[in-house]
């Protein structure tokens, strides 16, 4: 059975890249661009993994992770933080908020898929070529 993954990312290019990679590996993917809608979407979908940008408008990814971890329905869902801003101390701050993995952009495809499967388990179908 395919793993369910929800992506919270405001950048359309990154969103499509992550979605296409995950779907090509057999995952069932939902996407959210607005962090203000994320908690409701996560509750409705109950994914095995949430992949989240940290630099989001309106609500930061760090704050959104904290909100998830404070919610008894969502606190056990692993979170993989993805960010272009990988400064000193950022990983510690993100992990302290409750992220289970931290990947900096630009992503390495193999590192990304390995991190996803490390948190969610095998995605459910192996690599599927488009066509």
Task: Describe each model-derived feature in a short phrase.
Residues 9:
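Conserved acidic carboxylate
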Residues 45-51, 56:
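Active-site beta3 strand of CheY-like receiver
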Residues 19, 63, 86-101, 111-114:
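Alpha4 helix (beta4-alpha4-beta5 surface) of REC/receiver domains from two-component response regulators
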Residues 13, 107-116:
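C-terminal output helix
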Residues 16-24:
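Charged docking surfaces used in two-component/phosphorelay signaling
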Residues 13, 34-37, 60-66:
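Acidic catalytic/metal-coordinating carboxylates
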Residues 57, 75, 87:
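The feature encodes the CheY-like receiver
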